[in-house]
C-alpha cells in the first residue's frame, strides 16, 4: 500500500494495552442492494444502522460476515493479507443463504478504501496490535415468513485491536480424529450467524 511517511498521523492510543474490542473509527463503507442491484457504495462517518423491526437479519438471521486485519510492516507499509480470499468466501456464504453476492472486486476495493480512510488507526509496527476489518452483509427490509429478503446492506467497519488472547494463546494437547460430524452441504464453510 503506502509508506508510513505518506500516512496520516497515528491516533493517540495506547497501542500496547489494546484489548480485542470495538473502538469507533472515522469512516466505514456502506452499499445497498435494492431493485436487483447494488448501488455505488460510499464511505460514511455515520456508524448507526436503522432498519425495520422485521428486517430479515433480525427475524431470520440472514447475515454473513468476514474478518481480516491490516498491519504496518517493518518498512512502514500498511498491508492486508489476501482480502480476495475473504471476498470469495463471502460470495459463497451469500449464495448459500440466498443473498445477492457483493462483487469480489468491489469488496477488495472497499476494504482498501476503509483502511486508507482510517490509516491513523492502523497500529505501528511492533506494537502487537492490528486494525481489525469486519465486512458484513444483512437482509435489511421487512420479511415475515421464511424467505430471503429483497433488500440488503453491505458494510465494512474497522477497529484497532490488541491480541484476541492477552498474553498469547496457550498450547493444548489434542487428539485429531477422521470422524466428521458436520452435515453434508452444511454451513461449516460459511461465516454466518447460525
Q: Model-found features: residue ranges?
A:
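Short, hydrophobic/aliphatic alpha-helical segments
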Residues: 39-53
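Short, Gly/Pro- and small/polar-rich lid/capping loops
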Residues: 2-43
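Short acidic-glycine loop/turn motifs at beta-strand connectors
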Residues: 32-39, 71-76, 83, 140, ...
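Short helix/loop capping segments that flank catalytic or ligand/cofactor-binding pockets
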Residues: 40-41, 66-68, 142-146, 164-168, ...
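Residues forming anionic-ligand binding surfaces in small-molecule and nucleic-acid pockets
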Residues: 68-71, 80-96, 175-186
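Active-site pocket-lining segments that scaffold enzyme catalytic pockets across diverse folds
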Residues: 9-12, 96-170
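Conserved phosphate/anionic-ligand binding catalytic regions in large, soluble enzymes, centered on
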Residues: 54-66
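Conserved small/polar residues in nucleotide/adenosyl-binding loops
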Residues: 191-194
Amino acid at each position: 500500500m503506502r509508506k508510513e511517511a505518506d500516512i496520516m498521523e497515528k491516533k493517540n492510543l495506547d497501542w500496547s494495552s489494546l484489548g480485542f474490542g470495538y473502538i469507533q473509527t472515522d469512516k466505514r463503507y456502506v452499499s445497498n442492494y435494492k431493485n436487483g442491484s447494488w448501488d455505488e457504495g460510499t464511505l460514511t462517518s455515520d456508524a448507526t444502522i436503522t432498519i425495520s423491526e422485521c428486517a430479515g437479519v433480525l427475524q431470520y438471521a440472514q447475515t454473513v460476515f468476514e474478518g481480516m486485519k491490516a498491519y504496518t510492516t517493518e518498512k512502514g507499509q500498511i498491508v492486508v493479507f489476501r482480502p480476495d480470499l475473504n471476498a470469495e468466501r463471502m460470495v459463497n456464504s451469500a449464495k448459500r443463504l440466498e443473498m445477492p453476492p457483493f462483487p469480489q472486486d468491489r469488496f477488495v476495493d472497499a476494504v482498501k478504501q476503509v483502511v486508507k480512510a482510517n490509516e491513523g488507526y492502523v497500529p505501528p509496527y511492533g506494537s502487537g496490535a492490528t486494525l481489525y476489518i469486519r465486512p458484513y452483509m444483512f437482509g435489511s427490509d421487512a420479511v415475515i415468513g421464511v424467505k430471503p429478503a429483497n433488500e440488503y446492506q453491505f458494510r465494512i467497519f474497522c477497529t484497532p485491536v490488541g491480541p484476541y488472547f492477552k498474553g498469547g494463546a496457550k498450547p493444548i494437547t489434542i487428539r485429531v480424529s477422521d470422524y466428521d460430524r458436520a452435515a453434508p452441504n452444511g454451513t461449516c464453510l460459511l461465516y454466518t450467524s447460525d
